């Protein structure tokens, strides 16, 4: 089954050309099934790029997905056309009475700020609390994941001496997890951040389970069953050239930046980078969607009140 997105959303044509099954709202209305309703709270400045990256992953599953784009209510983006935001996005305050099977909260390039200094921090706290009554499963990504784990468990983010930047080897720490079906024992994931969460602080919270980790860049994917949440601090969703774009931007802007580790062939920025994480990206987000399908109530009014495991 395809992902349902507006026909005029830029991701629609991009994903159609890539062979991803997409359908318009008119086409979806003719199918007599309940799609999984997934929200994307997009905090990234490059809205269209981020929309497309996540739509690509959740649209590759055999289930019909209805993707809803959400923004913070008062925050005004400076890097995406206001016409795009008005046509495709709804403010959080407008959707807060609705229910979602899943919610992705993206990262944001504000990791140098204390959480309390973020202009929309108070409303984001409302979002986190809202997920416990209105969302069946929430996926916090990079800064979004660090913000969630801080909100629910008080775990801090720590500044690094230098940016963790490149493709780092990670280990599968819990092969029996339903989120890791099909995962190799070891693989690479793109990393691009100035902060980290420390494994010792995660281990001090008994209800948290580290699923993926790296000796070089620490914990990557954490399961929080009590809050029906996953936190990932790295970027499976990245396109093949996303790290290149970030590197070229900093070089052109005169910002000191190292060549991303283990990304370019022979670490040569003049050569085309190879995508070595795509299959695991599809596995992770496909497994997440599958787990939602297995456990979310058919009656959306019951979301936040019960879990209905179809495997029972």
From Swiss-Prot:
Location within or outside the cell: Cytoplasm
UniProt keyword annotation of NADP present: no
InterPro entries (alphabetical): Class_I_gatase-like, HST_MetA, MetA_family
Protein name as catalogued: Homoserine O-acetyltransferase
UniProt pathway: Amino-acid biosynthesis; L-methionine biosynthesis via de novo pathway; O-acetyl-L-homoserine from L-homoserine: step 1/1
Record's keyword terms, sorted: Acyltransferase, Amino-acid biosynthesis, Cytoplasm, Methionine biosynthesis, Transferase
Site (Important for substrate specificity): 192
Organism annotation: Ruegeria pomeroyi (strain ATCC 700808 / DSM 15171 / DSS-3) (Silicibacter pomeroyi)
Gene for this chain: metAA
Gene Ontology annotations of biological process type: L-methionine biosynthetic process from homoserine via O-succinyl-L-homoserine and cystathionine
Biological role stated in the UniProt entry: Transfers an acetyl group from acetyl-CoA to L-homoserine, forming acetyl-L-homoserine.
NCBIfam families per UniProt: metA
Site feature location: Important for acyl-CoA specificity: 111
Enzyme class at the top of the EC tree: transferase
Chain positions recorded as substrate binding sites: 163, 192, 249
GO MF, one annotated term: homoserine O-succinyltransferase activity
């Amino acid at each position: 089954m395809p992902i349902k997105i507006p026909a005029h959303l830029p991701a629609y044509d991009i994903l159609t050309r890539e062979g991803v099954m997409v359908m318009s709202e008119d086409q979806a209305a003719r199918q007599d099934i309940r799609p999984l309703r997934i929200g994307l709270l997009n905090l990234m400045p490059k809205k269209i790029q981020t929309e497309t990256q996540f739509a690509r992953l959740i649209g590759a599953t055999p289930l019909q997905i209805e993707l809803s784009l959400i923004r913070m209510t008062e925050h005004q983006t400076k890097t995406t056309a206001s016409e795009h935001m008005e046509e495709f996005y709804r403010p959080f305050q407008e959707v807060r009475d609705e229910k979602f099977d899943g919610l992705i909260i993206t990262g944001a390039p504000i990791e140098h700020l204390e959480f309390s200094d973020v202009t929309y921090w108070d409303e984001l706290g409302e979002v986190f609390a809202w997920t416990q009554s209105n969302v069946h499963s929430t996926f916090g990504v990079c800064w979004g994941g660090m913000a969630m784990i801080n909100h629910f468990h008080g775990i801090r983010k720590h500044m690094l001496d230098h940016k963790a930047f490149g493709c780092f080897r990670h280990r599968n720490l819990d092969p029996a997890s339903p989120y890791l079906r099909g995962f190799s024992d070891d693989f690479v994931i793109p990393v691009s951040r100035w902060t980290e969460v420390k494994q010792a602080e995660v281990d001090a919270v008994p209800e948290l389970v580290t699923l993926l980790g790296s000796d070089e860049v620490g914990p990557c994917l954490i399961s929080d069953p009590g809050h029906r949440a996953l936190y990932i601090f790295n970027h499976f969703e990245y396109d093949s050239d996303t790290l290149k774009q970030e590197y070229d931007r900093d070089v052109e802007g005169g910002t000191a930046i190292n060549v991303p580790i283990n990304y370019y062939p022979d670490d040569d920025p003049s050569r085309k980078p190879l995508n070595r994480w795509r299959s695991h990206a599809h596995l992770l987000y496909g497994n997440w969607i599958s787990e939602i399908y297995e456990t979310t109530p058919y009656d959306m009014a019951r979301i936040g009140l019960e879990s209905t495991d179809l495997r029972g």
